[in-house]
Structure formats: C-alpha cells, structure tokens
C-alpha cells in the first residue's frame, strides 16, 4: 500500500457512510453507522442535537479530524473545536443590511489593495427579510393605517431600500423579501425552512443561523436554528465554518396538560422564569415528554421563540406527527412532507427513536400548574401571575378609590396603558393566540365595551396568512372595531417601533408626570425599549392585550375588577369575555387552511425575472445617514491595540442589555444622534429609529450607551448613581453626556475599558452593541459574566472579553472610575490573565481574570483585529 493510501486508511472514510435513502432517489450520510463504528451502542443514547451535529460532521468535516470530532459528541466532551456548517443564513433588514454593508465595504477595501472585489460573495444561501423598519405612526383605529404606515416606511428608508435592492443583484446567493410581507421568523417557520434539505442529490437536516436572537423560533420544527450577531453571520455567509465546542445539552421534560383557558404565552412566560432560575445560559435545550407531544407547532414555536429570554442558545423539539401535520397545514409540497418523515425515521430523528436519548441534566416542568400570566415590568423572566396583581402592588384598591372620579370621566389615570399591541412572531405565528384575541374582541363588542381613548392599539401579524383566516372566520372586523386593525406585517412595537403618541396624550404624560406603560404580546420589555414615554412594559398573551386596552390601566385587577357594565347594568368581567378552548379550536380547525399559506407564499417566493447584474462596488451616497462606507479597515481600527493605560468609560451593574449598549427605539431630537441628524438636514419627523441607521457608523456610534435608562456607577449625586446616558471624563472628573465623553477620549486616542456585573450583553443580537464600543476606543470589557451572542460579537470586533473570578467584582474591588487598567499574560483560549488596576493614589491591585476567547479560532480572530480585518487578509491572500 502506498504512503498516501496508508495515510488515508488511518481516517474514517466519509464516503462509506453515503447511502441511498430508501424510497427516494436521494442519498444521505449515515451518522448512526459512523458513530457506531467508533463506539457501538452510542448513537441511541445521543440527544437530538448531537445526532444532527454528528450528521453534518460526517457530511462536511475534514476526514483527518472527523473521528476526533465525533468522539467529542460521543463522549460528551467540550475540549476540542469542531466545525459547524449551517445550511442557510436568515437576516432581517437591520443586522442583515449592516452585514451586507460590511461586505460592500470589504469589497472596497480589497479593491483599494488591488484585489478583485467581485470575489467577495456569500456562498451560503442568504435570505433577507425586511421586517424591522415599519413604525406604527398610525394606530389600529385608523382604517387606513396599513397604507399610511407603509408609505412612511418607504419614504424614510429610501436609502436603505436602495442599497438592499442593489444587494439582490450585486451579490450571489442573496434573496430578498421586501417590506410589507411579514416577520423573518414567522416566514421561516411557515415557508422557508424545509426541515430536511435536498441539494445536489443529498438529503440532510436543515440548519441555519439568523441575525436575530429569536431565530430559534424554527427549533419548534426540529431545525437547529440559532441567533448570531451580524459578524458571525458574515463568517457563515462567506462559507467559513462556525467553530464550536459541544454545548451543554439539557433535557426539559414537559409533563401534564395545560388547564382550560391557558395560552401558549402563559406557558412560555412560566417556562422562561423557571429556566432562568435553572441557569441554562448558552445551553441547547430539548423539550420532550407527554406534555411536549401534545403541543401544536404554534405552541412549540412560542416556546422556542423565547429561547434567548431564558438564556439558552436553542430550544429544540423532536420531529413527530405534529411536525408533519404542520407542514401539510402550511402548504408544503407533498413530496417534501414525505421526505421529512422518511428521513427522520431512517436516521433516528423521529420522536419515537429518541426515547432512549440520555441527558446529563434533565429538568421537569409541569404544564398543568401554569396559570394566567403577565411578565414585567422590565424583564421577560419576571413572571407576574394575574391572580397576584393586588398582592404584588400592581393593582391597588386605594388607587381606585382615589382616582375613581377622573377615571369615570375618561381622564388618563396614573398607570395608564398608553400602548396595547398585538405584535411579534412569538405570538402571532400561533393561530390559537390570534383567534383567542379576536374572540375576546367579539364578546367585548357584543357587550358594548370600548377601548379607553388614551390607548394606542395595533395589530401587526408576522404573516399575511393571519388576515386570511381571520377574514374567513368573520373575526377581523371584531378586532378592527376595538382599534386592533392591521397596521403592518412587521415587528413594529416588539422591536421598539411603536411610533409617535398622540401629541396631546404625550404632553399630558409630561405635564402630570404620569406613570404610563405598554402591554404587548412581544418577547422583550426592557426599560425604555417600547417607547420613551412608556416607563415600563408588560408582556401578555394577545387576548390579555385586548383586555388591557379595555381596562386602560395597569392599576387594575384584571381577574377581579369589572371592565364595564352591560345594558342591564350588570358588571362585565374578564371571565365573561374569555373564550373556551373548544371555541378557539373550532375556529382554528375550520378556518386555518393550506390554501391560505399557498396563496400568500407562492407569489412571494417567485423568482425575479430579468434581473440585471450591477457593478461590484456600491456607489456610496455621501449625504446618507443610513448607508455609509464602513471604516473598519482604516486608521486606528487597522492598527495596533493597547491593553495598557486604559481608563474606564463606564462601570455598570448586572443585567446590562444590548438595549443599554445601543438602543433601537425612536431617536429624540435632544440626543447626540438627533443633533447629528439635524446637522445633516434630516427633519425630526423623519429621524426614524436608531436601528434603521446602523448602516451609517457616524449616526450609529452616537447611539453607544445612549439609553436614558442607563446607570453608569461612575456618575453619582450625593452618593446615589444618576440615571442617564452619562459619563465622567478622567482625570478631570468632569461629568458629561456619554457621546461627549467618547469624543473627548477619541481625540486623545485614550484606550478604554468597560467594567460590568453579571449577564452582560443580554437581549438582541445586535452587532452594533459591540461595534459602538470598539469605535469608541474600548479595548476590553471585564464582567462577571457574558451572554453568548454579545460575547461573540465583541470578539468579532476585536474587543477582548475578560471575566472576573468567582467572588471578585467591581464592588469587592471598590472601583470608582479614577483607576488605570493594564492587562498582562498570554492571550489564549480560556487562559488566566492579570488585570492590574492602579488607583489614583498609586496603589496597585493584581486581579486574576479569565480570558473569554473560548476557542482557538476566536484567538485568531482577535489577533487579526476582528473578523472583518481577517476577511480582508484572507481575500487578499487568495
């Protein structure tokens, strides 16, 4: 045998596992046989996630590393990196657009160095859905709200949409669903995910990454889909593997059956609280058991959607009969449905074949104990049972007596619900939730109840199909009568695009200093996210959102207080409006049909005819505040970094979210971004949101730490931390607005550090939460812990994440912001480093910290200055 053949024989031969899939003309890779060849009897004990990861290794991994990679899965180890090759990238128009702006900028950088810009192309199927740019400027009680909101969206976003249109033809493998068609996760669930792919004659499990933390929505179908930042998405787009280590895979056994009248929203809010307490951060969860089997795909999707809210990476369900029925319901081709069932049963991905799966950790959750819930204020895992509203001090008898007169006179009370929004793919992709809301509206209309006049109501389904089945059931007019007309098919209020309030209502809130709130069927309620004048927000099921529009205040015991009286003077309670499960199921069963999905999606996914290929370089518009050539290959960002002599830009507490780091909501005229837009001659009416300007770094960097709800512990008054987008410039000790501090430090070329508490970077997967601090000159973030996506984004931008050892934090170190910081040691994956802190009096502290570059690939990315710098070097080397 030749030396070459001998060397090849030492490795697993991938092709021996390539077989014909019975009953088809397709082939597949038999991961079971590959695993059994290494460790007989192991495959049947593997969790669902491990089986899917094993398949893609057998199909894609380098033969030299295949056996070692499979052993990581078999032996449940996490000490070696292995490659993951997602089949698709799905994007919304904020992070997806900024990713494509980066690629367009990369083309420019390569052209400037004499390279071929046309070589920069996504090689993995990339699907961009425009869903984040519509604001609810016209509420659901305006019969023309949809058309008016869409017209405003087109006008405000002309620059952005021009760039996105260019991308369709300038880049290969990029498809675009334009504005006005729905939410990316719901379209992914209802149409885009095939569950099982078939390409070039090979069948394999669908997998994807998405530029939104709620990408796990389609985990409900058994598809590994995880949220990533735009930078990691760019890596996958360009055909690079996403290097990973075997995650913690946790089984969540769902037992019991839900009680009558309990919605999937109630369940997911309870599960979110439960799992947050169980500390499942960065884990892949697999829901199984009798309770899981009984849940519809709509219910499962509601649970999977909120994966980031309970801190996990994925929230998987097995493929089973519910999956097959859903694929049929949503109009998938019969051949595709048959392929899913055949492949799953052949490869051990069918639910029955996972009874023998073993988990190192199993949690148990009883669905029968779930009651009606809200979540809030401020955090989605802060569950609030509706029966405890009085006990928790939300509804107050003393308040009712004090304000009875003004409330009866239809004056806006303290605690007013100023926004009630049926919104978000979390709930509108679940027909049972939408129908339940419509049935509550119908009964309210029959009894003569109306929304309170200060409540801005809206209904923004994530799919056009919702309109069809509501019209079929005669229920859309019932929602419209209460002010819940369709305002758009987009994320809207859920991602902070709630639009302007009635000026008179806004002024009254200001003049009377009212505590006003929002109630929405979304997935996040962080302070300041929904609207600047909604001081807090509560998450609720769609039918509860309708009920709160009738109540008009959060100071209301929704279970016990009367919502009004009927014609006979009899009090009307929530129980009088709430539909039975049988009523809901009857409407869903009769009126949600495959033909509706086909009617919407066949036309939506028809290929564009006659597309003309454009020039490889984008013609940047110099006056644009939406799209600008990025700076990441220029000046200081392309040079050496300094980890010595750093000053703190901010010292922060626990649970800092990406909304704190780079908010998404409306831009106020008094903000740094607002002042810049005014200088650029943009009218205040067209400021739009922070999110929509993330393709222009000059606007977006002014959003860094711009959240007015921020508490920077360096800024105190009489010993109390002052709330606001504030900083203290050192060594002068001058308190100033955050942006002015950043500008000062940038002019001084002062390297910066941010010190934080636990769970730093929660929330949305926005890469600008990392880009903003990098452009500000931040070299290091040291925290007690990081949320997964944000930590990855920091690495991708060349910012070094460091973690305090247990028992050490900003408080034990008695930091006040006057210190200087240096980092010493060899920067390697997971290595111990020294953070040397020099106090103002010269005292030095040597603080051990852990380097949170978690893989060798991340070390390489950081060493290159970030993923964008590494891309440029790789393309030029080619």
Residue ranges and their predicted role:
Residues 2-152, 295-301, 305, 309-333, ...:
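N-terminal amphipathic, basic-rich helices that act as targeting or association modules
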Residues 26, 87-89, 126-128, 206-208, ...:
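Structural motif
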Residues 49, 180, 196-344, 350, ...:
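Mobile "lid/hinge" segments at catalytic clefts and subdomain interfaces of large enzymes
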Residues 62-254, 266-269, 372-375, 389-484, ...:
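Long, structured ligand/cofactor-binding scaffold of large enzymes
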Residues 85, 103-159, 289-399, 559-619, ...:
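Terminal amphipathic helices with adjacent charged low-complexity linkers/tails
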Residues 284, 288-295, 523, 743-787:
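Extracellular/luminal Protease-associated
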Residues 566-580, 587, 790-861, 869:
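Acidic, glycine-rich flexible loop/linker segments
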């Amino acid at each position: 045998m030749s030396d070459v053949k001998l060397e090849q024989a030492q490795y697993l031969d991938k092709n021996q596992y390539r077989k014909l899939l019975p009953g088809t003309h397709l082939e597949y890779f038999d991961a079971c046989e590959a695993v059994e060849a290494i460790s007989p009897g192991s495959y049947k004990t593997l969790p669902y996630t491990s089986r899917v990861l094993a398949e893609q290794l057998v199909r894609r991994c380098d033969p030299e590393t295949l056996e070692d990679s499979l052993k990581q899965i078999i032996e449940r180890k996490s000490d070696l990196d292995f490659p993951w090759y997602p089949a698709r990238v799905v994007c919304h128009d904020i992070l997806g657009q900024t990713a494509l702006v980066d690629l367009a900028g990369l083309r420019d950088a390569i052209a400037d160095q004499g390279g071929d810009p046309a070589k920069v192309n996504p090689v993995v199927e990339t699907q961009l859905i425009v869903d984040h740019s519509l604001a609810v400027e016209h509420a659901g009680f305006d019969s023309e709200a949809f058309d008016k909101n869409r017209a405003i969206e087109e006008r405000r976003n002309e620059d952005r949409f021009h760039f996105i249109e260019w991308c369709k033809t300038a880049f290969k493998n990029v498809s675009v669903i334009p504005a006005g068609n729905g939410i990316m996760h719901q379209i992914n669930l209802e149409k885009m995910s095939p569950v099982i792919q078939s390409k070039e004659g090979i069948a394999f499990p669908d997998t994807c990454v998405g530029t939104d933390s709620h990408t796990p929505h389609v985990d409900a179908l058994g598809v590994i889909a995880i949220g990533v930042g735009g930078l990691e998405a760019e890596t996958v787009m360009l055909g690079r593997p996403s290097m990973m280590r075997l995650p913690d895979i946790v089984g969540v056994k769902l037992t019991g059956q839900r009680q009558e009248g309990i919605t999937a929203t109630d369940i997911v809010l309870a599960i979110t609280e439960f799992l947050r307490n169980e500390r499942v951060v960065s884990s892949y969860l697999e829901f199984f058991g009798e309770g899981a089997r009984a849940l519809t795909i709509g219910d499962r999707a509601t649970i999977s959607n909120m994966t980031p809210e309970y801190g996990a990476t994925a929230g998987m369900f097995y493929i089973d009969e519910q999956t097959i029925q859903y694929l049929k319901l949503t109009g998938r081709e019969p051949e595709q449905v048959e392929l899913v069932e055949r492949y799953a049963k052949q490869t051990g991905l069918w639910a029955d074949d996972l009874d023998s799966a073993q988990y190192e950790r199993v949690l148990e959750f009883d669905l029968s104990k779930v009651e009606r819930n809200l979540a809030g204020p401020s955090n989605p895992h802060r569950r609030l049972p509706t029966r405890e509203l009085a006990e928790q001090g939300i509804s107050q008898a003393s308040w009712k007596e004090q304000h009875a007169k003004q409330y009866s006179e239809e004056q806006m009370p303290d605690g007013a619900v100023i926004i009630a929004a049926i919104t978000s793919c979390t709930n509108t992709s679940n027909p049972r939730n939408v129908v339940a809301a419509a049935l509550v509206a119908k009964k309210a209309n029959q009894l003569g109840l109306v929304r309170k006049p200060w409540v801005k109501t809206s209904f923004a389904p994530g799919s056009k199909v919702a309109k069809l089945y509501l019209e079929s059931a005669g229920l859309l007019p019932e929602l419209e009568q209460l002010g819940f007309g369709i305002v758009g098919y987009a994320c809207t209020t859920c991602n902070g695009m709630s639009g302007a309030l009635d000026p008179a209502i806004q002024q009254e809130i200001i003049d009377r200093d009212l505590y006003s709130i929002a109630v929405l069927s979304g997935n996040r309620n962080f302070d300041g996210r929904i609207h600047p004048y909604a001081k807090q927000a509560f998450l609720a099921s769609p039918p509860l959102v309708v009920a709160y529009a009738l109540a008009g205040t959060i100071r209301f015991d929704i279970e016990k207080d009367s919502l009004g009286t009927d014609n006979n003077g009899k009090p009307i309670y929530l129980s009088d409006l709430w539909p039975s499960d049988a009523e809901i199921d009857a409407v869903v069963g009769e009126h949600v049909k495959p033909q509706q999905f086909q009617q919407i999606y066949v036309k939506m996914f028809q290929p564009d005819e006659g597309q003309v290929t454009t020039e490889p370089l984008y013609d940047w518009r110099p006056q644009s505040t939406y799209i600008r050539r990025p700076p990441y290959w220029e000046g200081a960002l392309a040079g050496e970094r300094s980890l010595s002599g750093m000053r703190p830009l901010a010292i922060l507490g626990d649970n800092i979210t990406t909304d704190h780091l780079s908010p998404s909501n409306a831009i106020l005229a008094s903000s740094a971004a607002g002042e810049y837009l005014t200088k650029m001659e943009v009218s205040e009416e067209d400021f739009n949101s922070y999110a929509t300007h993330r393709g222009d770094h000059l606007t977006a960097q002014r959003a860094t730490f711009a959240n007015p709800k921020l508490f920077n512990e360096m800024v105190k008054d009489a010993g109390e931390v002052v709330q606001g987008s504030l900083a203290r410039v050192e060594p002068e000790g001058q308190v100033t607005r955050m942006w002015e501090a950043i500008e000062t430090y940038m002019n001084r070329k002062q390297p910066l550090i941010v010190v934080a508490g636990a769970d730093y970077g929660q929330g949305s997967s926005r890469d600008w939460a990392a880009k903003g601090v990098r452009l500000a000159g931040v070299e290091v973030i040291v925290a007690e812990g990081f949320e997964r996506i944000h930590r990855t984004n920091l690495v991708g931008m060349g910012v070094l994440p460091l973690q305090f050892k247990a028992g050490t934090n900003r408080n034990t170190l008695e930091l006040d912001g006057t210190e200087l910081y240096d980092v010493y040691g060899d920067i390697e994956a997971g290595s111990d480093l020294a953070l040397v802190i020099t106090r103002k009096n010269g005292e030095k502290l040597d603080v051990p910290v852990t380097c949170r570059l978690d893989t060798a690939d991340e070390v390489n990315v950081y060493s290159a200055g970030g993923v964008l710098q590494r891309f440029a070097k790789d393309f030029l080397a080619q």
